[in-house]
Amino acid sequence: MNQTIDTNKQRNWAATYDVIVIGFGAAGATAARFAADNGAKVLLTDAAPEGHEGGNTRYAGQVVLTGYDFDKMKHYFKQLFGPIKIDEKMLDTYVHGLTTIPDYFKRYLEIKSPVSYNKVHRDPDFEAFANGLSPEYPEFEGSETVDLTTVHDGYFDASLWKTLRGQVTKRENQIDVWLASPAKHLIQNPETGVVEGVQIQRHDQLVDIKANNGVVMALGGFENNNDDIQNFIGVPKLKVIGTLYNKGDGLKMAQEVGAKLWHMKSFEGFGFNTGFTFENTAEARGKFILSPWPDLSNGSIFVAADDGSRYVREDENGRHGHAFEHGSWKNPTVYSHPHLIFDREQYRQIKSRGKLPYDDFFKITVKANTIEELARKIKANPKTLVQTVERFNVFSENGEDLTLNRSGDTMRAFGDGPYYATPLATAMLNTQGGAKRNEQAQVLDAFDQPIPHLYSAGEFGGINANQYNGGGNLAECLIFGKIAGENAATVKHDIEVTPESTSTTVDLGGNDLSSDQALSNYSVGKDQYLGVSDAGIGGRVIVRVTYRDDQLKNVEVLEESESEDVGQKAMTELPKEMVTQNTYDVDAVSGASSSSRALKSAVRNAIQKATQPAKNSAD
């Protein structure tokens, strides 16, 4: 479908803005707020429905890569890129931004005391994790300058995302937010090459929205598009552990206007061992296993590829899904159906731990009396799997792994059956590929020339390639989001400027995040009270509590947008526990601490109103 303007015919614009930002994650939120701060009226549109906006930022560790010495940090990054060529001006812009992150938090995010990840490891559960990220490549020269900055001393709690989202909502007079409204096409003038607007699917209709000064592409990667995964990365499949809404839409739009693509093969992962999660057909999103799980790499257990042979060193801690290979860190080969293979003794060892980091571990595990039978059940080669077990046993007895160099003291020979196999998947955090940009955040064409009025930021065409240090993507969102927003807002004089307007024949709706809604949509009866919390990963949680004679009679969750997996589990299970125990202060659901905390906060808010009736209100 050709979306270029017919110069002999007037296009019917449904609305006009100064700047349109596509994608409401860290990069899009940043671009929108800085465009607004530079005087622009902004439309921020996202494909995800309310509560699922935020892209991968919602699910990230909330750490932002930071460096204190420009020269050392640049040298460190040169080693990360290795033989991969990177534009010097782009790298200088990025590294300079990294050295300003603490000040950025103070000046622009209103964080009075940003936390240095290196200095504060208060939570022992995260200390090893912290040491593995800052720096992620301690052997590289200049690594001593690497740090991570956080909003507070907490991780994986959407704290940065909620801060960025708040910067958007507080500018609701300047920024309109459209959710569940995917951009479909960029509208480019065929004579001038100027990107003049965006075609958006809004309320089941395609509408053309004009951008007087610029369009920012901040719509993430292609993690959820398996065709793109196979075509660009060249692997059969990857299991997403971030957002489910990054589907590669930006690639089509960018190619449609002649943009150059770069870093298409680069992607980051995270998980146990080198970067695994579990393959469970009941889950659209893979479980992010952050907690240490030594039993999966210690004992009579190994990882088998599709044919039953070993291919990764099980006791190696991956670096964002990268494993050490002949002098550098690479994404390991991705197979269609890898499995953990283990024996009865290992099964008992895992079983003895009680509650596991993954609740469905035994539910998805396959059992067989012999290795040959197990191979057939998992569609591996029986002869190959038998040989793999035999070699593993020899290595275990000799204390030396001659295949993959796993530490001998982590290996125990397989004993008698039964034997077990648990399906695995290579975990995918994010892709890096997309439209190539320059240091001004301008999207470039096939000849490295800027496409007029088109900008980008974030993981859609990210700067990071080859080896990656944690927090680098979020830093890029903040750095290039600011540049893109400011440059897109600059008044241009190469097209006819249209005043802000809306077609009277098209119902576009209003700002989907308008603060005028809140609790006014819900009613209460006798002994009922509304409670609200904005602490959820998906944003606001609203509950209606029935409270009588100091007894918590009922808890109804009226509004929430937590993640489909463990977040929803918290919303379903905790209200029953609260009523049973007559308190909001119940144990959190494993893996859903933020969602649990938000629900408890909302119920506490309602109970406070119940016990202080004079102050009870619905606002």
Regions found by a protein language model. Give the residues of each.
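Extreme N-terminal leader/targeting segments of oxidoreductases
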Residues: M1-V19, D37, T66, G462-N464, ...
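N-terminal Rossmann-like FAD-binding beta1-loop-alpha1 element of flavoenzymes
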Residues: V19-L44
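Conserved redox-cofactor binding core of oxidoreductases
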Residues: H96-L206, N226-D227, T274, S396-D416
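Glycine-rich loop(s) and the adjacent beta-strand/alpha-helix scaffold that form part
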Residues: R202-Q205, K210-F278, L474, F480-I483, ...
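A glycine-rich dinucleotide-binding beta-alpha-beta segment and adjacent secondary-structure elements
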Residues: H185-I187, V194, T384-N464, L530, ...
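An anion/pyrophosphate-binding glycine-rich loop and adjacent beta-alpha core
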Residues: L251-M253, K260-A380
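Active-site- and interface-proximal helix/loop "cap" or "latch" segments in soluble metabolic
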Residues: N521-A618
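Glycine-rich FAD pyrophosphate-binding loop
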Residues: D37-T57
